[in-house]
C-alpha cells in the first residue's frame, strides 16, 4: 500500500506529522485521510466499471 516505504520511513513521517499537527489533531487527520482514500478507491472502481461497460458496448457494436 505504501510502495517502498519501510517501517523507519513511516515512523519518521508519523513523527513529523505529530510535531506539525500535535497529538490532539492526529486522530481527526487520520480519519479524514482514511475517508479520502476510501472515496478515491470508490471513484476509481466506478471509473473502471464505466470504462469496462463502454468497452463491452463498443465490442458489441463492432461485432454486429
From Swiss-Prot:
<dbReference type="GO" id="GO:0043953">
    <property type="term" value="P:protein transport by the Tat complex"/>
</dbReference>
<comment type="subunit">
    <text>Forms a complex with TatC.</text>
</comment>
<feature type="transmembrane region" description="Helical">
    <location>
        <begin position="10"/>
        <end position="30"/>
    </location>
</feature>
<comment type="similarity">
    <text>Belongs to the TatA/E family.</text>
</comment>
<dbReference type="GO" id="GO:0008320">
    <property type="term" value="F:protein transmembrane transporter activity"/>
</dbReference>
<keyword id="KW-1003">Cell membrane</keyword>
<keyword id="KW-0812">Transmembrane</keyword>
<comment type="function">
    <text>Part of the twin-arginine translocation (Tat) system that transports large folded proteins containing a characteristic twin-arginine motif in their signal peptide across membranes. TatA could form the protein-conducting channel of the Tat system.</text>
</comment>
<keyword id="KW-0653">Protein transport</keyword>
<protein>
    <recommendedName>
        <fullName>Sec-independent protein translocase protein TatA</fullName>
    </recommendedName>
</protein>
<dbReference type="GO" id="GO:0033281">
    <property type="term" value="C:TAT protein transport complex"/>
</dbReference>
<keyword id="KW-0472">Membrane</keyword>
<dbReference type="Pfam" id="PF02416">
    <property type="entry name" value="TatA_B_E"/>
</dbReference>
<keyword id="KW-0811">Translocation</keyword>
<dbReference type="InterPro" id="IPR003369">
    <property type="entry name" value="TatA/B/E"/>
</dbReference>
<dbReference type="InterPro" id="IPR006312">
    <property type="entry name" value="TatA/E"/>
</dbReference>
<keyword id="KW-1133">Transmembrane helix</keyword>
<keyword id="KW-0813">Transport</keyword>
Amino acid at each position: 500500500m505504501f510502495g517502498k516505504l519501510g517501517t523507519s520511513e513511516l515512523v519518521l513521517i508519523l513523527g513529523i506529522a505529530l510535531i506539525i499537527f500535535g497529538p490532539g489533531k492526529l486522530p481527526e487527520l487520520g480519519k479524514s485521510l482514511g475517508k479520502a482514500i476510501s472515496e478515491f478507491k470508490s471513484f476509481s472502481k466506478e471509473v473502471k466499471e464505466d470504462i469496462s461497460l463502454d468497452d463491452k458496448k463498443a465490442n458489441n457494436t463492432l461485432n454486429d
